[in-house]
From Swiss-Prot:
It comes from Xenotropic MuLV-related virus (isolate VP62). One of its GO terms (biological process) is viral genome integration into host DNA. A motif (PPXY motif) lies at residues 161-164. Residues 1172-1318 form the RNase H type-1 domain. Residues 1442-1600 form the Integrase catalytic domain. Residues 449-464 have a biased composition (Basic and acidic residues). The record marks Y129, P130, F213, P214, L476, A477, L532, T533, L657, T658, L1328, I1329 as: Cleavage. Mg(2+) 4 binds at D1453, D1512. This is Gag-Pol polyprotein.
Length: 1733
């Protein structure tokens, strides 16, 4: 009862997410509503047995699928995705479908009842199908026995043929055949094709029986059996693809074998078992049994008929008879049909789209592959004429790019057949240039470009020289002329040019842009400058200024300045950005002119960053560095023989260099010569080991790498980002070098990622970097095995003090990529000079790939494994491509280095000679300085941290902490020092840099300056870890003994988690030891560790207090610290806070267990045992339960028989909170008494005894650092614990059934709590925990108005307390009420009703004077609420004005119709408001030009010039073009209210009518060309009756439109049309009887009174914001109303009319404020203000 039946349809709806996922795998999309419609209403009408609840029967699904895929008008293409998904669910069922699917048959089961198979397939052209021949009445000849032959028979197979049933004797066979001939006509058996395999003697048989050997007929007509040979089966198996790879090819093979070899039933099983897998064979047998047809020619499900036609077990067919052979022929036919049906793959159009033409593949071959894909992955036949269009489009789009582009440009492409396209493609394919021709063409183009470039360079040089001479001549001439003009007192201007005079050569007949003497061609590259800048100073083509020059970074961009000590101010020539209002007069050699100043710019100087304002002089030849900036630079200019030099105050060169913060330490490194000079013996002895002499490396022992992709990955193609010409030229040499080395090769790949040019700091060189982020997302992740640099040096013993450091050059390029993985890393590159335009990819492991470091590190480890084995006395450390070799002596180091270089050269790796450090006692490795078994921080690292300025932003602070954190091993207590800095790095935290942060910042810097040398870990010696803890921070130092001293190995520090930070000091020490032991393990590598601390924590770890530690944490600590093989505890020591090392003096150790016992609970005498002489024995309980969907709660304190206290708690109170409230109330009521209190709540009991103290020490935070629940109740309980004189809190089991006092009291408390919860709920429970001290109100100031109102209300004045009292409460004056309610509203922004409800629920100790009126005023004057809250104003409907006759008043609008065919996407609609007549024009654009064109060419000639046009505020109507046309023609164009479609209601409704009609017509006709169907839609709209019962056609012409019924036999009555006079009379009647009444009716509507809106001129209103964004107010304003109509407003600041429904009133200012008039500087203007000035 009550259970529902699960059906296939309901099952799919319950797992709809899985259904959509399966549909997505089939490359289709399904919707739930259509899924239900097709299953329950559509497919049952196909009459193929589909139930309304759905089915997973493959046979029924196949029949529905055949109906859906039926070609022509009877098909259902919209149902294809749904039936394909049904088939996928049944074919490969998910777990929730398998119980509803019939299990697949075992290998050879008894034949089950199979569902009906698919529709009949057309017969294949195969000899398996017997020909229909006329029956022969004559008796067939008797089969002859094989004559005895003396020749030996060839034994092809060792095993005997399969046994068959005993055959009847010849006479019996004769009799049977005669009987058969009399009953039915039997056709003679056709001779079977024999195999040329020799002959074989039949085995001996009984005289009465014989063993038949079908199916080869001998010379005497005897059938013989010739089984398959092993070689045949082997060749067929290995020389053909599997059935899953290419089912069509294997089906064709089996078909040919069935035709030529005529196999028996056993042979067929042997053939299927050899060529197919078990699952494939079962699928073929199932499909074959589906194809069995009954007597009616349709697929049958009758088991007897299916088993008779296609048995699964060996049948007893007699192949010597006609009936037996017919059975076998039918079996082969069904087997072939099963192969064909099973070979069909699920529909997957993506597979078809993936077939593309190869580079050298002919179009014919490509077409065959495309057709085969159609046959395999779609249900469509590519040979079907109806599919020729689809195949043709696929052939064009998927052809090679050059062929596809030319085919797309063929004329009259729609009329081309597939054969025509193939012929055109063959012509294009055969006309392709050969590789030799292409190379010759590229070579010629390169030579021509080089020749053209040389000529342009020569011309440019000549022009540059000529321009310099001309400028100098002009300058000298200007000076002379200027002096002469000064003497003459006049000014001479440059003569004006004539209209046809050239400004360049001054000749007439052409202009400067067409001047033949003006140099042409592209500008050459800018000359390279040797400045440490990130970019050149000027624009493209600008020359750098002459010496002395300097480059500074201005506003983030580098600018090269000419040092000009004669210039007072610095000058910028271009890209100034915003300019200020200031200007200055500049006097130069050519005269004076006024120029403007720029706003302040950030300028990076050598002395720091300054703010400076420049003069913007566009016509200045170069940017000038004047005396103002030279002063800020403190520059010094020296004149030497080589020229002027500009240096800083200390003599250093001035330069700007930008680089990453992590590389800044390299600036401070002292430059030195490379350790390996290029001419040294190391280079000559090992030429193959160095990149400088051995070239690009190649790891010869490493196989090409195959990059596996994720299972769901698909190729990603991202276009190349735009790249500047400078960057392209910068990376071009690198690309060319990699191409020459074979590391890059051209390719064609569906993958593509962009290439980024990255400029190297300090140079103009670029390097290519590929953005492989998208590829990294699609590649399988592998576990990274790169060594950790944190503990890598732990494997370096201090005894090895001779080092060699090698850095492998281009390390990743040493590993090859497999050809199948190379397309993943393709990118675009175009170089016309080299003839490259396409994609390039890497043949080696690329940089930027996420797995490159791990793959290379593992490969190099494998290659160097033999070296480590052969040299056990050497230490070889490897971090990716950085190698460190350590030895005990110089000789061993040199010998090992030679062996390592020889090994690297033989393996194919190359080291950088410039970075090599060979056989030295002091080297730099991974940023450390290694010397004498110790590691130091390099001075460069220290200088980097010390040189960073004080952080101003969280990002700068994170950069500082990251840089300093690298050095934390050298800084004792780093975590405690940096504690004030870390909170400022969190997102959303205000960056407030105070004294604490500055102190921490300076302490870290100071500690870094005094950083000691740390010893390298010696894994042969034990380690000692000294641990201390202070205020939640663990600090320690890891040491090893060196003689009598302890040498530090690392300083460790870490902050404890919030839980451990709240423990007592002894337990915090346990947590600190555990944390630092874990970190020290990274350096000790599991070696013995002795822990020394000022606490005896070993006893605590062995017997930890369970009330402080959880079981999981206790187990973790014990497993780590009680491992005696690795961790041991030393004696208790006192540590020096500065060094964390032990102090010489001894202190008496304390007892940690005793201290923990003292800090165990909250109250020392609190116990859980009953007090014998208690004053009270109470029972507490809290109850919380659901009733009618609402959670009720209550709490009670009782004795065994009576209720002491009971209260209902607010709805939603939890049971735990109720228990705390009950216990707290009991403690309060027993103040000063002895109390035994029982509670059945473990939560309340544990909080009082244990957890409360833990929470208090932890700061009331959880283990995750969040605030605990029931915080206020816990605090109240902890405070109430100290109220009773003596206290015992006892836990008792809940819901006891005994008769003890404890059970009775517990039941009483539980019943009282439930009864209290059912009563009226208290408004708040804060009264239970708040202080009982009465609240004294402050001194109130009452105004005269307040006093008058108080006397009216009958309030009394309290003389002693100094305030008025009403209703027993102090009265709060009006001003105080306003301040309180205004603050409350600003916090909550509640409505007046909600604020009243809130104040009524909270029991306020005051009586608020004029509360309701103040609430209303506060909410109405709130600006935030006015801008956000919705408006409830209701505006009555207005009346639209209509024309008084046809053609005078039109409404016009654009509407978009998608999809747009042939470029038509819009519909311009005109509606006559009088008659409703509609004119619509399809357009390609929505512009004012289109509107004007249709108005003048269509509306005006047919209907006359309109008097009024109405439209919305669209750009096509509100533009100046449309309005100007209307003004010229005298048309009154009325723009309706913005965002108010009802204002244009008639044309908007017509838009909807036309689009709905077009939609119906497209569905009915099956075409998408809505332009073709538009006349039918207009005809419908023009002949639809309006509100007055007349159609627009009848209103215009006075009669219905003429209709002709072409099926009427009497057409004569329709041939005579009315005369012209009759038409004129009808129009006159229409004008009198229709037009005038309609005009009168429209006028009556206008005369009806309309309720106007309440807004008046001068009111302030808020205007609705129609396009709001997130967190943006709904209303804008307020605005002042300027004009009004009955339905719309015009406001100040908005040009369009606004409908009254889109505004709401704004609160007017107080009446006391008045407008004031003020004078302004302009005598024609005055200023109006209101309010305080």
């Amino acid at each position: 009862m009550g259970q529902t039946v699960t059906t296939p349809l309901s099952l799919t709806l319950q797992h709809w997410g899985d259904v959509q996922r399966i549909a997505s795998n089939q490359s289709v999309d399904v919707k739930k509503r259509r899924w239900v419609t097709f299953c329950s209403a559509e497919w049952p009408t196909f009459n193929v047995g589909w139930p309304q609840d759905g089915t997973f029967n493959l046979g029924v699904i196949s029949q529905v699928k055949s109906r859906v895929f039926c070609p022509g008008p009877h098909g259902h293409p919209d149902q294809v995705p749904y039936i394909v998904t049904w088939e996928a669910l049944a074919y490969d069922p998910p777990p929730w479908v398998k119980p509803f699917v019939s299990p697949k048959p075992p290998p050879l089961p008894t034949a089950p009842v199979l569902p009906p198979g698919p529709s009949a397939q057309p017969p294949s052209r195969s000899a398996l199908y017997p020909a229909l021949t006329p029956s022969i009445k004559s008796k067939p000849p008797k089969p002859q026995v094989l004559p005895d032959s003396g020749g030996p028979l060839i034994d092809l197979l060792t095993e005997d043929p399969p046994p068959y049933g005993a055959q009847p004797s010849s006479s019996a066979r004769e009799n049977n055949e005669e009987e058969a001939a009399t009953t039915s006509e039997v056709s003679p058996p056709s001779p079977m094709v024999s195999r040329l395999r020799g002959r074989r003697d039949p085995p001996a048989a009984d005289s009465t029986t014989s063993q038949a050997f079908p199916l080869r007929m001998g010379g005497d007509g005897q059938l013989q059996y010739w089984p398959f040979s092993s070689s045949d089966l082997y060749n067929w198996k290995n020389n053909n693809p599997s059935f899953s790879e290419d089912p069509g090819k294997l089906t064709a093979l089996i078909e040919s074998v069935l035709i030529t070899h005529q196999p028996t039933w056993d042979d067929c099983q042997q053939l299927l078992g050899t060529l197919l897998t078990g699952e494939e064979k079962q699928r073929v047998l199932l499909e074959a049994r589906k194809a069995v047809r009954g007597n009616d020619g349709r697929p049958t499900q009758l088991p007897n008929e299916v088993n008779a036609a296609f048995p699964l077990e060996r049948p007893d067919w007699d192949y010597t008879t006609t009936e037996g052979r017919n059975h076998l022929v039918l079996y082969r036919q069904l087997l072939l049909a099963g192969l064909q049906n099973a070979g069909r793959s699920p529909t997957n159009l993506a597979k078809v789209k993936g077939i593309t033409q190869g580079p050298n593949e002919s179009p014919s071959a490509f077409l065959e592959r495309l057709k085969e894909a159609y046959r395999r992955y779609t249900p469509y036949d590519p040979e079907d004429p109806g599919q020729e269009t689809n195949v043709s489009m696929s052939f064009i789009w998927q052809s090679a790019p050059d062929i596809g582009r030319k085919l797309e440009r063929l004329e009259d492409l729609k009329s081309k057949t597939l054969g025509d396209l193939v012929r055109e493609a063959e012509k294009i394919f055969n006309k392709r240039e050969t590789p030799e021709e292409r190379e010759e063409r590229i070579r010629r183009e390169i030579e021509e470009k080089e020749e053209r470039r040389r000529a342009e360079d020569e011309q440019r040089e000549r022009e540059r020289d000529r321009r310099r001479h001309r400028e100098m001549s002009k300058l000298l001439a200007t000076v002379v002329i200027g002096q002469r003009q000064d003497r003459q007192g006049g000014e001479r201007r440059r003569p004006q040019l004539d209209k046809d005079q050239c400004a360049y050569c001054k000749e007439k007949g052409h202009w400067a842009k067409d001047c033949p003497k003006k140099p042409r061609g592209p500008r050459g590259p800018r000359p390279q400058t040797s400045l440490l800048t990130l970019g050149d100073x000027g624009g493209q083509g600008q020359e750098p200024p002459p010496e002395p020059r300097i480059t500074l970074k201005v506003g983030g961009q580098p600018v090269t300045f000419l040092v000009d000590t004669g210039a007072q101010h610095s000058v910028l020539t271009q890209n100034p950005g915003p300019l200020s209002d200031k200007s200055a007069w500049v006097q130069g050699a050519t005269g004076g002119k006024r120029y403007r100043w720029t706003t302040d710019r950030k300028v990076h100087l050598a002395t720091g960053k300054v703010t400076h304002s420049f003069l913007h002089v566009p016509d200045c030849p170069y940017p000038l560095l004047g005396r103002d900036l030279l002063t800020k630079l403190k520059a010094q200019i020296h004149f030497e023989g080589s020229g002027a030099q500009v240096v800083g105050p200390m003599g250093q060169p001035l330069q700007v260099l930008t680089l990453n913060i992590e590389d800044e330490y390299r600036l401070h490194e002292t430059s030195k010569e490379p350790d390996v000079p290029l001419g040294s013996t190391w280079l000559s002895d090992f030429p193959q080991a160095w990149a400088e002499t051995g070239g690009m490396g190649l790891a010869v022992r490493q196989a090409p790498l195959i990059i596996p992709l994720k299972a769901t990955s698909t190729p990603v193609s991202i276009k190349q980002y735009p790249m500047s010409q400078e960057a392209r030229l910068g990376i071009k040499p690198h690309i060319q070098r990699l191409l020459d080395q074979g590391i890059l090769v051209p390719c064609q790949s569906p993958w593509n990622t962009p290439l980024l040019p990255v400029k190297k700091p300090g140079t103009n060189d670029y390097r290519p970097v590929q953005d492989l982020r998208e590829v990294n997302k699609r590649v399988e992740d592998i576990h990274p095995t790169v060594p950790n640099p944190y503990n890598l040096l732990s494997g370096l013993p201090p005894s090895h003090q001779w080092y060699t450091v090698l850095d492998l050059k281009d390390a990743f390029f040493c590993l090859r990529l497999h050809p199948t993985s190379q397309p993943l890393f393709a990118f675009e590159w175009r170089d016309p000079e080299m003839g490259i335009s396409g994609q390039l990819t890497w043949t080696r492991l690329p940089q930027g790939f996420k797995n490159s470091p791990t793959l290379f590190d593992e490969a190099l480890h494998r290659d160097l494994a033999d070296f480590r084995i052969q040299h056990p006395d050497l230490i070889l450390l490897q971090y990716v491509d950085d190698l460190l070799l350590a030895a005990t002596s110089e000789q061993d180091c040199q010998r090992g280095t030679r062996a390592l270089l020889q090994t690297l050269g033989n393996l194919g790796y190359r080291a950088s000679a410039k970075k090599a450090q060979i056989c030295q006692k002091q080297v730099k490795y991974l940023g450390y300085l290694l010397k004498e078994g110790q590691r130091w921080l390099t001075e460069a690292r220290k200088e980097t941290v010390m040189g960073q300025p004080t952080p101003k932003t969280p990002r700068q602070l994170r950069e500082f902490l990251g840089t300093a954190g690298f050095c934390r091993l050298w800084i004792p207590g780093f975590a405690e020092m940096a504690a004030p800095l870390y909170p400022l790095t969190k997102t959303g935290t205000l960056f407030n840099w105070g004294p604490d942060q500055q102190k921490a910042y300076q302490e870290i810097k100071q500690a870094l300056l005094t950083a000691p040398a740390l010893g390298l870990p010696d894994l042969t010696k034990p380690f000692e870890l000294f641990v201390d803890e202070k205020q939640g921070y663990a600090k320690g130092v890891l040491t090893q003994k060196l003689g009598p001293w302890r040498r530090p190995v690392a300083y460790l520090s870490k902050k404890l988690d919030p839980v451990a930070a709240g423990w007592p000091p002894c337990l915090r020490m346990v947590a600190a030891i555990a944390v630092l032991t874990k970190d020290a393990g990274k350096l000790t590598m599991g070696q013995p560790l002795v822990i020394l601390a000022p606490h005896a924590v070993e006893a605590l770890v062995k017997q930890p207090p369970d009330r402080w530690l959880s079981n999981a944490r206790m187990t973790h600590y014990q497993a780590m610290l009680l491992d005696t093989d690795r961790v041991q505890f030393g004696p208790v020591v006192a540590l020096n806070p500065a060094t964390l090392l032990p102090l010489p003096e001894k202190e008496a150790p304390h007892d940690c267990l005793e201290i923990l016992a003292e800090t165990h609970g909250t109250r020392p005498d609190l116990t859980d045992q009953p007090i014998p002489d208690a004053d009270y024995t109470w029972y507490t309980d809290g109850s919380s339960f659901l009733q009618e969907g609402q959670r009720r709660a209550g709490a009670a304190v009782t004795t065994e028989t009576e209720v002491i206290w009971a209260r209902a708690l607010p709805a939603g109170t939890s049971a735990q909170r109720a228990e705390l409230i009950a216990l707290t109330q009991a403690l309060k009521m027993a103040e000063g008494k002895k109390l035994n209190v029982y509670t059945d709540s473990r939560y309340a009991f544990a909080t009082a005894h244990v957890h409360g103290e833990i929470y208090r020490r932890r700061g009331l935070l959880t283990s995750e650092g969040r605030e605990i629940k029931n915080k206020n109740e816990i605090l109240a309980l902890l405070k109430a614990l100290f109220l009773p004189k003596r206290l015992s809190i006892i836990h008792c089991p809940g819901h006891q059934k005994g008769n003890s006092a404890e059970a009775r009291g517990n039941r009483m408390a539980d019943q009282a709590a439930r009864e209290a919860a059912m009563k009226a709920v208290l408004e708040t429970s804060t009264l239970l925990i708040e202080d009982s001290t009465p609240y004294t109100p402050p001194h109130f100031h009452y105004t005269e108005t307040d006093l008058k109102r108080l006397r009216e209300l009958g309030a009394t004045y309290n003389q002693t307390k100094g305030y008025w009292v009403l209703q027993g409460k102090p009265v709060m004056p009006d001003q105080s009420v306003f301040e309180l309610l205004d603050s409350l509203h600003r916090l909550t922004h509640l409505s007046p009703q909600k604020m009243k409800a809130l104040l009524d629920r909270e029991e306020s100790p005051y009586y608020m004077l004029n509360r309701d009126r103040t609430i209303q005023y506060v909410t109405e004057t709130c600006t935030a609420c006015a801008q956000v809250n919705a408006s409830k104003a209701k505006i009555g409907a207005g009346v639209r004005v209509r024309g008084h006759r046809p053609g005078t008043h039109w409404e016009v609008d654009f509407t978009e119709v998608k999809p747009g065919l042939y470029g038509y996407k819009y519909l311009l609609v005109f509606v006559d408001t009088f008659s409703g007549w509609v004119e619509a024009f399809p357009t390609k654009r929505e512009t004012a030009k289109v509107v004007s064109k249709k108005l003048l060419e269509d509306i005006f000639p047919r209907f006359g010039m309109p008097q009024v046009l109405g439209s919305d505020n669209g750009p096509a109507f509100a533009s100046q073009v449309s309005q100007s046309v209307a003004d010229l023609l005298g048309i009154d164009w009325k723009l309706h209210c913005a965002y108010r479609p009802q204002s244009s209601g008639q044309v908007e409704r017509m838009n909807r009518t036309i689009k709905e009609t077009l939609t119906k017509l497209t569905l009915a006709s099956g075409t998408r060309d809505w332009v073709l169907l538009l006349p039918l839609a207009l005809y419908r709209a023009r002949n639809t009756p309006g509100p007055h019962g007349l159609t627009p056609y009848e209103i215009l012409y006075g009669a219905p439109p003429p209709l002709v019924n072409f099926h009427d036999p009497e057409m004569s009555k329709l041939t005579n049309s009315p005369s012209l006079q009759a038409h004129l009379q009808a129009l006159q009647a229409v004008q009198q009887e229709v037009w005038k009444p309609l005009a009168a009716a429209y006028q009556d509507q206008l005369d009806q009174p309309v309720i106007p809106h309440p807004f008046r001129v001068g009111d302030a209103v808020w205007v609705r914001r129609h396009q709001t964004k997130n967190l943006e107010p709904r209303w804008k304003g307020p605005y002042t109303v300027l004009l009004t109509t009955p339905t719309a407003l015009k406001v100040d600041g908005i040009s369009a009319w606004i409908h009254a429904a889109h505004v709401k009133a704004a609160t007017t200012p107080p009446a006391g404020t008045a407008w004031k008039v003020q004078r302004s500087q302009n005598p024609l203007k005055i200023r109006l203000t209101r309010g305080a000035p």
